[in-house]
A protein has these predicted regions:
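Secretory targeting and sorting signals
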Residues: 1-33
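N-terminal accessory beta-strand-rich subdomains and adjacent acidic, glycine-rich linkers
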Residues: 36-280, 600
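Beta-strand-rich binding/interaction modules
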Residues: 69, 575-599
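An acidic-aromatic substrate-binding cleft motif
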Residues: 254-330
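Aromatic- and carboxylate-enriched substrate-binding clefts and catalytic-loop regions
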Residues: 335-498
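Catalytic cores of secreted or luminal carbohydrate-active enzymes
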Residues: 500, 504-546
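Carbohydrate-binding surface patches
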Residues: 549-586, 624-627
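C-terminal beta-strand-rich structural cap/linker in extracellular carbohydrate-active enzymes
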Residues: 606-640
Length: 640
């Protein structure tokens, strides 16, 4: 045989081997198991650490399921997958046609949140399914150190999505910390000792469960205008929480579709609390130049001054003066500023020429304070009007907008969010959404989003000490949360007997713009609190859970760029001495605490080694604030 013929046959052989190998990898994927007669495939986190996702296909009716395991125990029991469109039922009758796996590594810098520099490492598996009629469904599964997520990918021509079959079945001996769903996401969290005993009804996609395999926070990520927001639906005495779309309305699909990530943040309580998985799954920033995006504390005037302040230039200048004295970078003007003088909720048709806002912005800028302003979202629904409002505000020098009362997670409203975010980014305006959805990865994709409400904050009267201690493990894991702490003058606080607890919330709750809701007079009456608030940094480099029990206790430490650790704690229950471990690093630390005394706030200091436990006195339903810095002989304060 000539060398030429040998080469020809060798080429054919290599081609055939490659084809056979590809078939083996996709149609008969490695890692398949046979539990009974079902086939199952594992997806593990790099580099093989927990958790593990198991995708299974029932051969009897072809319905897919997902199981999540960690440390040899179930976190999520076998739970249904799939969805139904106008053209096909993609929740059963499926067969696997292929599978591929890749490693995803992404590095990014966050302008807000628990940490600044982030690295996301995930294993991604793509499962290709089809029905006997030929309809196709791809399932993407990602597994990371801190969780599991999946999404559906549909080709063109599949039709509108009618519903999802997605659900999460918890082990029956799990506990739940959940809040009933409402469009503004503001209802309080409640703790149930069994997942099945939670009342029937809808629950938010920020549900925390304590399972035999660890904690699991169910959420979603990468929600945009191609889909609608989802919530969980629970039937009485059931361990299953089903995914329901907004008002059960069909999802309009044009072309192909990627659904949001159905996300399970899982691990021990520390892992879940410190997780950035919801952001990690979201698309990278759409804002190339982020140099203008500057977070930081703000003096918010609504709870301090109400309607009168919103319509008074004199009052707003007073707040600007106080923010400047405290070196807080922002002051927020709430509702009323564009209304007719002396009238409420009536827009001045000549607001652009009559408004005192340009004068306030100039006044504030001269003192080093940026002004942010409130807007009702309906002013920004029409593209022409949106451009008029935002361009005018930007030309005046306004630094940000607080947009309110969307109160919907419909597909149409999610499209509006994208339009508003594109416009605010173009005009270099920071954003705070109120009456809104929750972040769901939005802050990575649109880094000008400093914070969002989606929580029953300081202005509500139905908060409890248990609610305060649940939020760090639920809502605030998802993203920045505008609780607006620091309202010492409010008589309706659940921690009204604990000014130290109120102070601690300013650190315990992360928000890119930490809107401080107190009056200048209330801060002046509490010099220990005022001095602490003056030290708050613009952003956090790192976050660590020191101790906690969802709904009962939470103590978090957040590191500033200068190496100091700010610590906030809140507790539900009787007065006691809290044992707080210092997970701050080796060496000796000077810890300054602010606690409640019989005559007001008390400031104390102690020196402790990293890893040691300090004792902090806490009043009933109270808390504390602290500041820790490296100790050296002669150092007596952590203040700069």
């Amino acid at each position: 045989m000539t060398e030429r013929l040998k080469g020809y046959f060798m080429s054919i052989a290599l081609t055939l081997c490659s084809a056979l190998l590809a078939t083996a990898v996709t149609a008969l994927p490695a890692g398949a198991h046979t539990g009974g007669s079902a086939a199952a495939w594992e997806v593990k986190a790099p580099p093989g650490s927990s958790p593990t996702a198991v995708v299974a296909l029932d051969p009897a009716d072809g319905h897919p399921t997902l199981t999540v395991r960690r440390a040899g125990e179930q976190v999520i029991a076998p739970s249904p997958l799939g969805l139904v469109t106008e053209q096909a039922d993609l929740s059963k009758g499926l067969e696997l046609t292929g599978r591929t796996t890749r490693t995803v590594t992404e590095r990014y810098t966050s302008t807000t949140g628990k940490s600044r520099e982030r690295v996301a490492r995930m294993t991604e598996a793509r499962f290709r399914f089809r029905t006997t009629e030929g309809a196709r469904l791809d399932l993407l599964v990602r597994v990371a150190r801190d969780g599991v997520a999946y999404r559906y990918v549909l080709p063109r021509g599949t039709g509108n999505v009618l519903r999802e079959a997605s659900a999460f079945t918890l082990p029956t001996d799990s506990q739940a910390v959940v809040n009933a769903y409402r469009a503004d996401n503001e209802l309080p969290f409640k703790r149930y000792e069994s997942v099945a005993t939670a009342p029937a009804g809808p629950y938010s996609m920020q549900a925390l469960f304590n399972t035999p395999g660890g904690y699991a926070l169910i959420a979603e990520s990468d929600l945009n205008g191609s889909y609608a927001g989802a919530h969980l639906t629970h039937e009485a005495n059931s361990p299953t929480y089903k995914v329901s779309l907004w008002n059960d309305e069909p999802i309009a699909v044009q072309g192909s579709l990627k659904t949001p990530w159905r996300t399970i943040v899982t691990g021990d309580l520390t892992t879940v609390t410190e997780s950035t998985l919801v952001d990690d799954l979201a698309p990278p920033s759409k804002v190339r130049d982020t140099s203008w995006i500057k977070p930081g504390p703000a003096l918010w005037t609504w709870l301090a001054g109400g309607k009168e302040a919103g319509q008074s230039l004199t009052a707003q200048k007073k707040y600007v003066d106080y923010a400047a004295e405290r070196k807080w970078p922002y002051e927020v003007v709430d509702a009323g500023w564009y209304y007719k003088p002396g009238e409420w909720d009536v827009i001045d048709p000549d607001w652009r020429t009559n408004s005192w806002m340009p004068e306030l912005v100039r006044y504030a800028a001269a003192k080093g304070v940026g002004v942010q302003v409130w807007l009702h979202y309906t002013l920004l629904t029409d593209p022409v009007e949106r451009e008029k409002w935002l361009s005018t505000l930007a030309s005046w020098g306004v630094k940000g907008v607080k947009i309110d009362f969307m109160d919907s997670e419909s597909q149409e409203r999610m499209r509006w969010y994208e339009e508003a975010l594109e416009a605010t980014a173009r005009h270099h305006l920071l954003v705070n959404f109120h009456g809104s959805t929750i972040p769901k990865g939005m802050q990575r994709t649109w880094p000008q989003v400093m914070t969002m409400e989606g929580v029953g904050g300081e202005e509500k009267r139905n908060n409890t000490a248990e609610q305060l201690a649940a939020l760090p493990f639920t809502r605030n894991v998802i993203g920045s949360m505008d609780f607006t702490p620091g309202a010492f003058h409010r008589p309706f606080r659940p921690n009204v007997a604990s000014d130290a607890g109120e102070l601690g919330l300013t650190v315990l709750y992360e928000s890119g713009i930490q809107n401080l809701a107190g009056t200048p007079e209330s801060y002046e009456a509490r010099p220990e609190a005022r001095g602490y608030l003056e030290q708050l940094p613009a952003r956090w480099e790192e976050t660590r859970l020191l101790t906690g029990d969802p709904g009962r206790a939470a103590v978090l430490a957040r590191r500033a760029a200068d190496g100091r650790w700010f610590i906030g704690g809140t507790f539900a229950g009787a007065a006691h001495t809290a044992d707080v471990p210092l997970r701050l690093g080796a060496g000796r630390w000077l810890v300054e605490t602010v606690t409640d005394g019989s005559a007001g706030l008390v400031r104390g200091t102690q020196v402790a080694k990293g890893g040691a436990t300090i004792a902090v006195p806490v009043v009933a339903d109270g808390g504390f604030a602290a500041l820790a810095c490296r100790w050296h002989p002669g150092r007596t304060t952590c203040e700069n």
